[in-house]
C-alpha cells in the first residue's frame, strides 16, 4: 500500500527544494561570476556555472547511492521482525 503524502509534507519538501536550489544558485554564482562590467554572460562564466551544477548533481547522486547502500546493509544486519 502506497503511503499518502500530506499537503504539509509536500510544502515541506518544496521548501527544502527551494532552499537547496537557492543555495546552489548562490554558491555557483559567487564562484563563477566575477565581472559585472557587462550585461552579457561570458562564455567562461557559463562553462563554470554548468560545471558547478554538474559537480553538485554528481555529488548528491553519490551521497544518495551511499545512503541507500548503508540502509541495505543495516537491513541485512538487523532484519525486521514480522508483524503478527
Curated annotation (Swiss-Prot):
GO terms for biological process: protein transport. It is a peripheral membrane protein. GO terms for molecular function: metal ion binding. A motif (Twin CX3C motif) lies at residues 28-52. GO terms for cellular component: mitochondrial inner membrane. It comes from the Eukaryota. Keywords: Chaperone, Disulfide bond, Membrane, Metal-binding, Mitochondrion, Mitochondrion inner membrane, Protein transport, Translocation, Transport, Zinc. It is found in: Mitochondrion inner membrane. Disulfide bonds join 28-52, 32-48. Mitochondrial intermembrane chaperone that participates in the import and insertion of multi-pass transmembrane proteins into the mitochondrial inner membrane. May also be required for the transfer of beta-barrel precursors from the TOM complex to the sorting and assembly machinery (SAM complex) of the outer membrane. Acts as a chaperone-like protein that protects the hydrophobic precursors from aggregation and guide them through the mitochondrial intermembrane space. Heterohexamer; composed of 3 copies of TIMM9 and 3 copies of TIMM10/TIM10A, named soluble 70 kDa complex. The complex forms a 6-bladed alpha-propeller structure and associates with the TIMM22 component of the TIM22 complex. Interacts with multi-pass transmembrane proteins in transit. The twin CX3C motif contains 4 conserved Cys residues that form 2 disulfide bonds in the mitochondrial intermembrane space. However, during the transit of TIMM9 from cytoplasm into mitochondrion, the Cys residues probably coordinate zinc, thereby preventing folding and allowing its transfer across mitochondrial outer membrane. Belongs to the small Tim family. This is Mitochondrial import inner membrane translocase subunit Tim9.
Amino acid at each position: 500500500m502506497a503511503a499518502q503524502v500530506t499537503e504539509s509534507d509536500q510544502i515541506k519538501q518544496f521548501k527544502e527544494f527551494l532552499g537547496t536550489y537557492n543555495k546552489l544558485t548562490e554558491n555557483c554564482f559567487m564562484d563563477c561570476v566575477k565581472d559585472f562590467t557587462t550585461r552579457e554572460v561570458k562564455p567562461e562564466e557559463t562553462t563554470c556555472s554548468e560545471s558547478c551544477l554538474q559537480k553538485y548533481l554528481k555529488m548528491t547522486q553519490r551521497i544518495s547511492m551511499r545512503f541507500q547502500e548503508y540502509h541495505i546493509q543495516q537491513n541485512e544486519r538487523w532484519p525486521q521482525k514480522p508483524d503478527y
